[in-house]
Regions:
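Terminal helix/beta-alpha structural elements that buttress the NAD(P)+-binding lobe
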Residues: 1-138
């Protein structure tokens, strides 16, 4: 698996089992260095305008999914998913089992008291957060 991110996130990507590649300019070349024949699938979770590159790397629109770029998906014919709300309870139960077994963890990047919700929102909008932002309710 190949994961893209800033150099500051590369150790984390390795911890997740991915080979890190810098995102942004040169991303395609970095992926090609690791996968000269391209990749089997590409998942866009950032919505940063890379769908044309992902289509080329994955060999076509049928091998690309985005959860972050609705307009780009329409423009390029890529599948877009918001998830399947009908399966949400089933998936939540599965995640709970994985957490209990120690096979899944969700890293917390930063916590905020509910009164600081505006600051939490600003931090999230700025990006570059590793882990989830959590609002604490007293």
């Amino acid at each position: 698996m190949i994961g893209t991110g800033s150099p500051a996130t590369h150790d984390h990507l390795r911890e997740l089992g991915a080979e890190p590649v810098n995102y942004g300019e040169g991303m395609s070349e970095g992926v090609r260095a690791l996968a000269p024949e391209g990749v089997n699938w590409a998942l866009d979770v950032a919505g940063s305008g890379v769908l044309p590159e992902l289509i080329e790397l994955a060999g076509g629109v049928d091998h690309v999914l985005t959860i972050a770029d609705f307009a780009g998906a329409q423009k390029h014919g890529v599948r877009f998913s918001r998830g399947d709300s009908g399966r949400a309870l089933y998936a939540l139960a599965e995640v709970g089992d994985l957490v209990e077994a120690g096979k899944f963890s969700l890293p917390v990047g930063r916590t905020f008291p509910l009164a600081d919700v505006a600051e939490a929102h600003r931090v999230g909008e700025a990006g570059h957060v590793r882990g989830k932002l959590v609002l604490l309710v007293d």
